[in-house]
UniProtKB/Swiss-Prot annotation:
GO biological process: phosphatidylethanolamine catabolic process; phosphatidylinositol catabolic process; phospholipid catabolic process
Entry protein name: Phospholipase B-like protein F
Glycosylation site list: N85, N107, N118, N121, N208, N312, N537
UniProt family annotation: Belongs to the phospholipase B-like family.
Keywords of this entry: Glycoprotein, Hydrolase, Lipid degradation, Lipid metabolism, Secreted, Signal
CC terms in the record's Gene Ontology section: extracellular region
Subcellular localization, as worded in the UniProt entry: Secreted
Species of origin: Dictyostelium discoideum
Superkingdom of origin: Eukaryota
Length: 563
């Protein structure tokens, strides 16, 4: 995606099972442990080396991106936190993250702004986007700051405190020649929302809105849209004996973002919220996940999503800056929800209509190995501008699995977002049931019986031999659009660019009991897909400051302990 000063947005980037057997911490293959360097923050927001027992909180950051693909951030606030003094703890949480991760955040910001804004200065950000940011942030702060009519209101305020603390922490720690403005740091939080904010601004500035809405996209445009904006593959899998329940997520994104991945464990012992500890995959400088992949040990829930791109541009009329963007709502839903249905209800409040996803929520509290699935174990919600639909899909999951692949499930959402219209025009590539990934999941998931099987399917790309790929490396559970190639038909399947699968994360009932996931960072590597390298052909196409040069990492265990 490029955002240029004329504000014409061009979204093309050149760019047999035993549950007791999963004990990854005992397997050298997954070992990542090195002693961390602790820092503590006091009530004056002074950061000192060491883990000080009477501090506001403490944490560490291990920048191991070049080692295994992931930074590891641990931030924990002190148990002395009360409802009356909660705001300072949320602010301190953000401050410590900004302080500890500033160097990786700087690298990510330079790549982010260069690739998305064509420049790294605040003046390079298009004026309409700056205006949207300011209107949205002013609305949020004026509506919710110092308002405590509900726990929800308080948590919106706490997200504001956390972000402002993050900005202060970054600015305090960063070198004088690597400073970022608060506006720039706020724009990093838009990583998920940005494309739909851009779509809304395009719609608003269209001279003839009727013509803009009614213009029919070509198959080439649709395929390019899916390639550069279609984000992620997801899978929830119950084994045939009901002995284990897996949930997994493979992020699709711009390749440069793979260089700044951080797994974060954030513990804020707020007595007013159930979700006070969260382990999630994220990026430097981003307070939420953006993938998304959240594990919430305190409520025993895991949440993932895949994106449903907006094909019906008339929906952008329902986007408004007077709303809560995804990055705020995701944090609040994680904190306030104790059940999957509660999560859907909390997430959809003040819906911005940006980052329209299919969200999947597994409530492991309701899961007992080798027993039938209980109602409300698994919910989904699909959001779009101006609306949403949600439902308990446990009965469907009980049949074996729930796959997710950037197509809306609910017929009403499918129709409203424009998919039914374009399916009639262009056929199976748009279809929920017959698109390549849908057929791959349907064919291959019955063979997945173990953690190894989950790893294999979520990084799968056999485009040279898989008939459902048709010779195209983008038609895979883990796409590799950089490789090129494709079938003779349709001729428009020719997109080549720096986009595709950039990671995979998996957890399960037994892993969640240990606060564990496994993860791999980098563009998928298979017999058909060699390791991606920032060679001379690609290095000038996409900024990637400080990124690993070659992505050929292994799976690792993610725990991020307090030891």
């Amino acid at each position: 995606m490029k955002i240029i000063n004329s504000f014409v947005f061009i979204f093309v980037l050149l760019f047999v099972f035993n549950t007791n057997a999963i004990k990854l911490s005992e397997d050298e293959k997954y070992s990542i442990e090195e002693k961390p360097e602790w820092y503590s923050i006091d009530s004056n927001f002074a950061v000192s080396p060491g883990k000080i027992s009477d501090a506001l909180g403490w944490g560490y950051y291990k920048n191991e991106i070049l080692k295994d693909g992931w930074g590891k951030l641990y931030v924990e606030m002190n148990k002395f936190m009360t409802p009356e003094n909660s705001s300072i703890y949320y602010e301190a949480t953000g401050y410590l993250e900004g302080y500890l991760t500033w160097s990786t955040t700087w690298n990510y910001s330079q790549a982010y702004f260069q690739n998305y804004m064509n420049g790294t200065n605040e003046s390079d950000i298009p004026t309409p986007l700056v205006e949207f940011l300011k209107i949205n942030y002013d609305w949020m702060t004026s509506t919710f700051s110092n308002r405590d009519e509900s726990v929800y209101d308080t948590q919106v305020s706490n997200v504001i405190y956390q972000f402002e603390g993050f900005a202060r922490g970054y600015q305090q720690a960063a070198d004088s020649d690597k400073q970022l403005t608060t506006l720039q740091l706020l724009l990093l939080q838009y990583a998920g929302d940005l494309e739909d904010v851009a779509g809304y601004l395009e719609y608003e500035m269209a001279q003839n809105k009727t013509e803009y809405i009614n213009r029919v996209k070509s198959l080439k445009e649709i395929e390019t849209l899916f390639a550069v904006k279609g984000r992620c593959s997801g899978l929830v899998r119950i084994t045939p004996d009901y002995g284990e329940l897996f949930i997994s997520h493979t992020t699709w994104g711009s390749y440069f973002t793979a260089g700044y991945r951080i797994f974060k464990r954030i513990i804020i012992p707020d007595p007013t919220v159930p979700g006070n500890e969260i382990l999630f995959a994220s990026y430097a400088g981003v307070l939420t996940s953006d993938d998304d992949f959240f594990m919430i040990p305190s409520t025993e829930m895991v949440i993932i999503e895949t994106t449903n791109d907006i094909l019906n541009t008339s929906l952008y009329q329902y986007v408004t800056p007077n709303s809560l963007l995804y990055f705020v709502r995701s944090i609040i839903a994680n904190r306030l929800s104790n059940t999957a249905q509660e999560w859907t209800n909390n997430f959809i409040q003040y819906n911005s209509g940006t980052y329209s996803n299919q969200w999947m929520i597994v409530d492991y509290k309701l899961f007992t190995p080798y027993q039938p699935l209980q109602p409300n174990t698994f919910w989904i919600i699909e959001q779009l501008p101006g609306g949403f639909m949600s439902a308990d899909m446990t009965e469907v999951l009980a049949l074996g699995n729930w796959p997710s692949f950037n197509r809306p499930f609910f017929p009403e959402i499918y129709d409203a977002m424009g998919y039914s219209y374009y399916e009639k025009l262009y056929g199976d590539i748009i279809s929920y049931d017959l698109n390549p990934r849908s057929k791959m999941f349907r064919r291959d998931v019955p063979n997945v019986m173990s953690l190894d099987g989950m790893q294999q399917i979520m990084t799968q790309n056999n485009y040279k031999s898989d008939p459902f790929s048709g010779g195209f490396p983008g038609n895979a559970i883990a796409a590799r659009y950089d490789l090129g190639g494709g079938p003779a038909e349709p001729l428009s399947w020719s997109f080549i660019g720096l986009h595709g699968a950039i990671d995979s994360k998996i957890t399960s009932y037994s892993l969640l009991q240990q606060n564990q996931a496994i993860a791999i960072n980098g563009m998928t590597v298979t017999p058909d897909c060699p390791p991606f390298t920032w060679n001379s052909n690609w290095s000038t196409v996409s900024a990637h400051y400080g990124s690993p040069e070659t992505f050929d990492f292994d799976w690792i265990s993610i725990t991020i302990t307090d030891k």
